[in-house]
């Protein structure tokens, strides 16, 4: 019928059952249908799983904040990734978010059984060629001389 009914249908049929979002409370209404005036209109927040999915979506504007929120809810086994991902985010945000994108895509493609707990070692199982290439170039780059590094950067600037 309208966009609001579509949004609430998606919430009820997809986001809530998959625990991507959950109801955070209800706001009272002064106007509108009596039933909604009595029970209020619900508002929602992203769960930890929802935050992880949001980190994989490039159109999301405040992903730095979401990353901090995600790790504030992390288990001890997930903490090992927080420091390195936070450091990589400062110098290489596109690469960092591509890791989340690959992780969530692997889940959507049934290559990873569960999104949580967050474990980047699961990515090793999917054998992603672009990650292998990125690791290879980084390993090679750190071994180059200063001049060769400068030349490599100039070359990459020309092709990207």
Predicted regions and their residues:
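Intrinsically disordered, low-complexity segments enriched in small/polar residues
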Residues: 2, 41-42, 153
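Beta-hairpin "wing" of winged helix-turn-helix
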Residues: 19-37
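Exposed, interaction-prone assembly regions rather than primary DNA-binding/catalytic cores
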Residues: 60-158
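Long, contiguous C-terminal modules that act as interaction/assembly or targeting platforms
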Residues: 1-2, 76
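Extended amphipathic secondary-structure runs
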Residues: 18-20, 44-46, 160
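Short, amphipathic alpha-helical interaction segments positioned at domain boundaries
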Residues: 35-70
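Functionally constrained cores in energy, signaling, and assembly domains
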Residues: 10-12, 21, 49, 56-64, ...
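Short amphipathic alpha-helical interaction segments
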Residues: 2-25
């Amino acid at each position: 019928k309208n966009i609001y009914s579509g949004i609430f249908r998606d919430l009820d049929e997809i986001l809530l059952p998959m625990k991507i979002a959950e109801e955070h409370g209800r706001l009272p209404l002064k106007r509108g249908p009596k039933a909604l005036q009595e029970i209020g209109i619900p508002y929602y927040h992203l769960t930890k799983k929802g935050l992880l999915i949001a980190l994989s979506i490039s159109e999301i504007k405040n992903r730095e904040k979401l990353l901090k929120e995600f790790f504030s809810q992390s288990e001890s086994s997930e903490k090992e990734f927080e420091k390195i991902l936070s450091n990589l985010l400062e110098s290489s945000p596109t690469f960092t978010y591509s890791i989340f994108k690959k992780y969530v895509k692997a889940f959507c493609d049934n290559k990873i059984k569960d999104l949580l707990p967050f474990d980047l070692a699961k990515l090793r199982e999917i054998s992603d060629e672009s990650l292998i290439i990125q690791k290879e170039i980084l390993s090679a780059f750190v071994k180059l001389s200063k001049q060769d590094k400068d030349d490599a950067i100039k070359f990459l600037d020309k092709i990207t």
